[in-house]
């Protein structure tokens, strides 16, 4: 316990001294050191799945009908481009109709010890073979077949270029139920929350996935063969959604990616909202 306290004190001193970017990196590295003991890299036998009938999942804690307009438009875009699939938009009250989660997770999020975003991270790991799309994702085309055909696919980051500690984001996930990476992440999260009732870092999922990605030949092989989804391009629209709308810039981004990560923390321009439904 004294060793942990000393480590925390050292981190607090470093956080006070360094700028915002360095503070973010320090927090991420300390979180990874703490999470390391929970990593679980067991690999299960691979089973075949029917990619043509993959369900699509999303989540809004208070229910789809209570989501803000931006989120409603995002859901509409998913229906427009992936309406041939079974689309399930869950809420806290409907989860039990679709999947069985350990009661501990419900208790943690209800008590406020687990943020809703991290509860959502847990949920997506229990949905077996699926495509997960965060509620803040807008589609402007169908999901490419090469992604549907993959056993595991997430949005990628360039840690050096993006000045970040992780090489993935979890707002879009394509995963088979027996994906080595999916199961390793799931078991690691289970190991962590079985012993802890606090959030070590908001980006726990990304930290864990990055740490696991090359831990075994099986994990690395699956990671290396996944289609490349460029996080910088997928997130570009978020940076301009509240500015003067440019149809030319919007069309250019749509030509580069089928999905766009937005945020409900910004007020989108009226022109932007109008074009979301086009």
Which ranges hold each PLM region?
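Glycosyltransferase-associated regions of secretory-pathway enzymes
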Residues: 1-120, 137-278
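Solvent-exposed aromatic/hydrophobic patches embedded in short alpha-helical segments
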Residues: 119-130
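Short beta-strand-to-loop acidic/aromatic patch adjacent to the donor-nucleotide binding site
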Residues: 128-138
